[in-house]
């Protein structure tokens, strides 16, 4: 069982068949469940380009990413877990669908050789 995080309600989703571990995946990518946009900006202040963290979104069951852009400013974007059984994620763009690492790089508009979770 995995917990889908939401500011309003925690929901559980059965993911037995695939073995996809939602919480483990999120924590590998700098999951910060208790912070908002302003706190994310403070945490990322002074970090290198494409450093990111994940957090709950204030919009329903969505998740949010906060990351440092090329210009040094922090950008925020949202994405959704569309298939908890297989760990398929999606951002608003039709080609931003796939595994969490792929969708993260798509949102940051960088390759897999760039970008690192905040430590």
Predicted segments with their positions:
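Eukaryotic phosphotyrosine signaling hubs
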Residues: 1-119
């Amino acid at each position: 069982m995995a917990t889908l995080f939401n500011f309003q309600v925690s929901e559980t989703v059965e993911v037995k068949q695939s073995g996809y571990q939602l919480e483990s995946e999120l924590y590998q990518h700098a999951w910060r469940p208790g912070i908002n946009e302003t706190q994310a900006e403070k945490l990322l202040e002074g970090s290198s380009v494409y450093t990111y963290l994940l957090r709950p979104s204030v919009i329903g069951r969505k998740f949010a990413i906060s990351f440092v852009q090329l210009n040094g400013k922090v950008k925020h974007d949202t994405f959704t877990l569309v298939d908890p059984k297989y760990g398929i994620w999606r951002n608003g763009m039709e080609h931003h669908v796939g595994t969490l690492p792929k969708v993260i790089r798509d949102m940051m508009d960088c390759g897999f050789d760039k970008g690192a979770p905040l430590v």
